[in-house]
Amino acid sequence: MRPGNNDAGELVRTAALSATQFLRLKKVEGHKKVKAGDRVVDLTHLDKVYWPDQGYTKGDVIRYYIQVSRYILKYLKDRPAILVRYPNGISEEGFYQQNVKELPDFVTALKLKNQAGRTLNYVIYSDLASLLYVVNLGTIAQNPWHSRTKNLDEPDYVVIDLDPHGAPFSTVLKVALVVREVLRDMGMNGYPKTSGSSGIHVYIPISRGHDYAEAARFAEAVSNRVASLAPKLATVERKISERKKGQVYVDWQQNARGKSAASVYSVRARPLATVSAPVTWDEIAGGFDLRDFTIKTVPDRLKKKGDLFEGLLKESQRLPRLAREQ
């Protein structure tokens, strides 16, 4: 029998709650069993404080992921997970875990080679039960691969990561609009979201048949064009010491097999419990405050605006010829 996910001591012997019943709890504390589909997931130490300044707990994170599960699971399903665990909250340094050796029966794993050539046992996101399992391990942010298990060498999208590294957020928004302009000139659409930290991610959906090398060449071409159109605002220079003050780093190098980025609707291990939230291009143009997107505000935003990122799953775009050459 494979071990479960109780991480300390005996679980309190109580009947399993449905996800709806869990959300109705006025106070989430101790240990709980929650039914997720036909599975029962043990959730432990729910009153452990993860964000000391706000008093947000592990239970608050789990509550959030249950609230947004019907949305986030569309973007996680069938993707290998890179776990970044904060079992004691954000006040302590987290750690990466890709090789997971012991899993309950309801969590799928797949042995894959990482970029260094090592064979690792990756958790595969499949349903609410698997999501709750990894969150219970202290995995605050969800970092899936860009490809699914059926087509591991073919990413579903290209990612352009706008990293301010000290530049004003207003500059990040300006650079995002340049990214949109470059994509339009190429006949492509992109979907922006906050990184959940200090930047913006632009995701470009692509059709089947493109490998990671093609995705990377396309991302590099877009990034170089952005930097050439707005040299005072943007750069593709990796060395921080070589960048001009106030430039936003246009990072295209996350487009490789085994790389990941925080999923849309993912919580981040950052102050205020911010969330990587989809935004409209009109919001990019008008400006907004990153602090407005947290575990306390995003569920209501979803109810009002729906899933602003769903085009990523519906749209299929062939990469321009430049990405297929060489």
Model-predicted regions and their roles:
Residues 84-86, 190-196, 237-241:
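Short beta-strand
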Residues 1-55, 62, 73, 77, ...:
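C-terminal accessory nucleic-acid interaction domains of nucleic acid-metabolism proteins
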Residues 87-152, 158:
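Basic, low-complexity intrinsically disordered segments
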Residues 203-215:
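Catalytic palm subdomain of template-directed nucleic-acid polymerases
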Residues 180-194:
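Active-site palm subdomain of RNA-directed nucleic acid polymerases
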Residues 195-204:
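Short, conserved phosphate-binding/catalytic loop or strand-edge motifs used
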